[in-house]
């Protein structure tokens, strides 16, 4: 990760202003500017495990990954540089959390792409750190203000829930399909066979809805769930608990923290990383699945029909089949055979 995002390029136009600052970087940290900008001291807090992986290699313990930042994460910082995400409720959660910890008088910078809705930062922070726009370039806005009043932050107030066929789904800001079950997941669920047994891995688990729905009609499966997102990991744990389903849930960059092999891997893989379309995770999922499937095990994923997954599936497994499709989505199935092991 060396190329800077447009938001970071805008910040670099002001790099002289940051040389004496003790900076906390937070929000949608899609590059390694926090590790490379010349400052008096730098810390970073992220809810994205893959962003933490990159930053921690260069920043060590000064890069932190968690759902909620703590006093230790912001210690000694006099400046916040916040990268605005595409999701406004996610920004609200993170900013209220961070501003409740930082001392009054902290310099606050918010930067983001115009299409991500960064302008709404002004209204969001009006009562705490009134912002002014100080730069506009690369289709991004940079805003500056000073923290005048700490907000009260209560993470519990950000939880939401909805029901799907009698199942309770717990959600948090930034979790995929936060307001209801997406069409792709519905299609994938329709293909799952009742009374399935064995070890099942749900990659990119989101709020955990695929796993709890699968477990309801296949109670003998043993579930493992993972996601890069701290909100997703916590939401999945809560969804499992709310439905009395057991399973292991942890943060992982696709298979980075996954141990062992499974009889089935299911996923509705992401193809957006922040505002950037990215197929990397799905391709890593397909190619890496052969190292985590038992012989005869299967990978079953749902994806937008236009995405180029058939070629990667055939390269990796030797073949694939489409077991369900609509105009927009396809469910792909590939089986772990000797042919696949050579791939």
Swiss-Prot record:
<dbReference type="InterPro" id="IPR002052">
    <property type="entry name" value="DNA_methylase_N6_adenine_CS"/>
</dbReference>
<dbReference type="InterPro" id="IPR023543">
    <property type="entry name" value="rRNA_ssu_MeTfrase_C"/>
</dbReference>
<keyword id="KW-0489">Methyltransferase</keyword>
<dbReference type="InterPro" id="IPR029063">
    <property type="entry name" value="SAM-dependent_MTases_sf"/>
</dbReference>
<keyword id="KW-0698">rRNA processing</keyword>
<dbReference type="Pfam" id="PF05175">
    <property type="entry name" value="MTS"/>
</dbReference>
<keyword id="KW-0949">S-adenosyl-L-methionine</keyword>
<dbReference type="InterPro" id="IPR046977">
    <property type="entry name" value="RsmC/RlmG"/>
</dbReference>
<comment type="subunit">
    <text>Monomer.</text>
</comment>
<dbReference type="Pfam" id="PF08468">
    <property type="entry name" value="MTS_N"/>
</dbReference>
<keyword id="KW-0808">Transferase</keyword>
<dbReference type="InterPro" id="IPR013675">
    <property type="entry name" value="Mtase_sm_N"/>
</dbReference>
<dbReference type="GO" id="GO:0005737">
    <property type="term" value="C:cytoplasm"/>
</dbReference>
<comment type="function">
    <text>Specifically methylates the guanine in position 1207 of 16S rRNA in the 30S particle.</text>
</comment>
<dbReference type="GO" id="GO:0003676">
    <property type="term" value="F:nucleic acid binding"/>
</dbReference>
<comment type="similarity">
    <text>Belongs to the methyltransferase superfamily. RsmC family.</text>
</comment>
<dbReference type="InterPro" id="IPR007848">
    <property type="entry name" value="Small_mtfrase_dom"/>
</dbReference>
<keyword id="KW-0963">Cytoplasm</keyword>
<dbReference type="GO" id="GO:0052914">
    <property type="term" value="F:16S rRNA (guanine(1207)-N(2))-methyltransferase activity"/>
</dbReference>
<protein>
    <recommendedName>
        <fullName>Ribosomal RNA small subunit methyltransferase C</fullName>
        <ecNumber>2.1.1.172</ecNumber>
    </recommendedName>
</protein>
